[in-house]
UniProtKB/Swiss-Prot annotation:
The gene is rpsB. Residues 227-257 are annotated as: Disordered. Keywords: Ribonucleoprotein, Ribosomal protein. Residues 241-257 have a biased composition (Acidic residues). It comes from Thermosipho melanesiensis (strain DSM 12029 / CIP 104789 / BI429). The lineage of its organism: Bacteria, Thermotogati, Thermotogota, Thermotogae, Thermotogales. Gene3D superfamilies: Glucose-6-phosphate isomerase like protein, domain 1, Helix hairpin bin. PANTHER family: 30S RIBOSOMAL PROTEIN S2 PROKARYOTIC AND ORGANELLAR, SMALL RIBOSOMAL SUBUNIT PROTEIN US2M. This is Small ribosomal subunit protein uS2. It comes from the Bacteria.
Length: 257
């Protein structure tokens, strides 16, 4: 069984990279060619590397490991929240707080404050306070929910971090590498693949592409925890290859790099 089909990757636009003026030369081996000033990612390599990332996350989950989903760019926020909640992962989808990993004990105190305020709200304790104090506490609560709402159950640093756009989430990547926490990430043509342990070459700007890849990482985590396969039944023949990308888009020849 395949983790993802070539058709799914194509339909989600995973193969579209950035403009040729904006690229990282380290990504050259994952690029098939260029068309109309846009790099085209080699989906054969994407498929293979996604499978490696899937197996890694699945095996970590089977060992009882935890995973943190990170994606704060607008296109990723809702997907990160939905898929993390679906598979029972932790998540950050608005703002990465400095020291979230490297100074986790301090961050944990803020998470505890969030839980305390939520309990006060649920118990009606806010209603017994002066309106000015209610307003102040609700502002604090809203801010904590936004930044830490996906971390309430995280009592230690995670075993794996999944990231959408390592350039955007460079602070998360830095902290993870500092603590030697394995990273899995969608890596577009403008990113540095050397910073990531398990790269998934792909479009990190299109919502459909982010949704597809993130859902597969969530499936891997669920499969590891539950022991039930979430992989796709084969739907297409092996001979489908990267060249077919261009037949689908138009008949112009691509520019090899």
């Amino acid at each position: 069984m395949a983790v993802v089909t070539m058709k799914q990757l194509l339909e989600a636009g995973v193969h579209f990279g950035h403009r040729t003026q904006r690229w990282n030369p380290k990504m050259k081996e994952y690029i098939f060619g260029a068309r109309k000033g846009i790099y085209i990612i080699d989906l054969q390599k994407t498929s293979k590397l996604l499978e490696e990332a899937y197996n890694f996350v699945r095996d970590k989950a089977a060992e009882g490991g935890t995973i943190l989903f990170v994606g704060t760019k607008k296109q990723a926020q809702q997907v990160i929240k939905q898929e993390a909640e679906r598979c029972g992962a932790f998540y950050v989808n608005h703002r990465w707080l400095g020291g979230l990993l490297t100074n986790f004990q301090t961050i944990r105190k803020r998470i505890d404050k969030l839980i305390e305020l939520e309990e006060m709200e649920a118990n009606g304790e806010f209603d017994n306070l002066p309106k000015k104090e209610q307003s102040r506490l609700r502002r604090i609560l809203d801010k904590l929910r936004k930044n830490l709402g996906g971390l309430k159950e995280m009592d230690r640093i995670p075993d794996v971090i999944y990231i959408v756009d390592p350039r955007k989430e460079r602070n998360a990547v830095y902290e993870a590498n500092l603590l030697k926490i394995p990273t899995v990430s969608i890596v577009d043509t403008n990113c540095d693949p050397d910073e990531i342990d398990y790269i998934i070459p792909g479009n990190d700007d299109a919502i459909r592409a982010i949704q597809l890849i993130t859902s597969k990482i969530a499936d891997a985590y669920l499969e590891g925890k539950e022991g039930v396969s979430y992989q796709e039944e084969p739907q297409e023949q092996k001979e489908e290859n990267s060249e077919e990308i261009f037949d689908i888009e138009d008949e112009e020849e691509s520019e090899e790099i």
